[in-house]
Amino acid sequence: MMLPRCFVTVLLMSSVLYIGGETSSEVLGPVVSTEAGSFQGMELTTHGERVIYAFLGIPYAKPPTGLLRFKKPQPADFIQGTYKATEKPPSCFQLDSDLQLPWADPDSPMKEDCLFLNLWTPASLSTEEEELKSVMVWIHGGGYTSGSSALDVYDGQTLSSSGDVVVVTMNYRLDAFGFLNSLTEDAPGNMALYDQLLALQWVHTNIKYFGGDPNKVTLFGESVGAFATSFLALSPLTKGLFQKIMLESGSAYNKLTVNSIDQAKNNNQLATLVGCANETFTLISNPEEVVACMREVAPAKFTQTYYKELGSEREKINFIFWPHFGDDILPTRTAELIKEKNLTALFAGVNSVEGSALSVFFFPEVYQMFVESNLTLTKAYATILMNEFFKVFNFQDSAKAIEFYLGDVEDDDEEGIRSALFGVVGDYIITCPTIYLADKYSERGANVQFYRFDRRPSTSQWPPEWMGAAHNDEIQFVFGMPVRYPEKYTEEERTLSEYMTRTWTNFVKSEDLKLKNGSQWPSYSLSEPQFATLQTNEQIIGSGQRKAECDFWRPYFDI
């Protein structure tokens, strides 16, 4: 499957909101001795004068450089002396695209030596078993080509202090560094997932020294971070590393996976562009030599130069830097993996207009046309765009899908036409795969609760009101940005953020979720697929979210 490079930036912007500044005071904190070494963190006085400790930039793997580039990660060496864990780590090398907005740029330097994690913990730091805190481990989104645990929006201090939990965020390798596949151990693909696995193993071994309970770990993520979270939940290699998951806008039923052979064939194009392969000397025919050559290529050449060599944005393709099935971490496809797992608790949800931001990056010129030139979106043009979208995914029943979404929309109903376009993109990529996994968890007897985020942030980077609550808009509320930066938000948004951080951390601690009025959050089941809205006005309980749309798509997914 060949994806336009502009589409990669869709999920790229996922989870990379940056709002600068800090509100907490910082002083050196205690030294914590672990099985990985001794680490000195910072003491933070957060909102409400709560004190927590932050340990930033802890290495969990050896630098994936030199001979270790493109290989599975190796555990970091034991640290001699005391490691000063007071600065967020560098970001992993990632895409430099003209489509990224300024606020989507990483707020730290990019380095290949980037496999670090950060953690925030309540100041008690008790290691007594009965006093250990529940743990939340976050996997950021970004299309597997962008993102960083150093971004301010992922600062875990508010979650930790408000919810009395330990919060962990991690970097993992991106783009070619995380997914190059030569069909050999020199570059086996899925390195990013193995990075995440190693970080979870580090947490399991060491989190008790920071006051966290290794037996009460919840893994959560957004967009491809949610994809990865649910993949890891189904992997045979993660047994005992975490107990439940939370998914924000995404699941393992997504269409953005590949088989190894196709991945290697497409990765050969990258090897050719950086001067390490040609028509007769390929990544598949000569993997050892080609990968050895690629280890000598400057990191920036992978993430910048070769994309620019491909010409226009429309011509840029995704070299299929996505997870693949068929190795130890993902032995087979999601539908088979899920049969083998004992599924426990799931809290999941989507945003009300997932497809708006995704459509903008899939067709960036369209957004500019409608916003800057005030043009009208017609059914004819929407049909062209939908057909282009379906070509990317090699979807054969495009006429049937277009009729389903546009057939009953009047020619002069621009709002309805726009809603249909956003629906196609959002339903296919995010909303329906998330619902399908919730269905499967419920079918297997797991405790499932579902939300729909409905608030368009006052800090939104999207001028048109019709963008709505777009992909990734909920993250700033989950991590408490309105609490940390009240001057940038309304009082209603601050209240919503406080409620959401409480909801997320309550799920982690007890799964006892409450609605705003104090009543019980509804359970999600196949017979009653109930959800609760997250918005600044009255909370609504709904059922069968996007039911007709997801029933339409269901036969096209391997569930």
UniProtKB/Swiss-Prot annotation:
It holds the Pfam family COesterase. GO terms for cellular component: extracellular space; plasma membrane. The active site is at 223 (acyl-ester intermediate), 354 (charge relay system), 471 (charge relay system). One of its GO terms (biological process) is acetylcholine catabolic process. It comes from the Eukaryota. Residues 1-21 form the signal peptide. It is found in: Secreted. The modification Phosphoserine is found at residue 223. It catalyses: acetylcholine + H2O = choline + acetate + H(+). Keywords: Disulfide bond, Glycoprotein, Hydrolase, Neurotransmitter degradation, Phosphoprotein, Secreted, Serine esterase, Signal. Belongs to the type-B carboxylesterase/lipase family. This is Acetylcholinesterase-1. It comes from Trittame loki (Brush-footed trapdoor spider). The lineage of its organism: Eukaryota, Metazoa, Ecdysozoa, Arthropoda, Chelicerata.
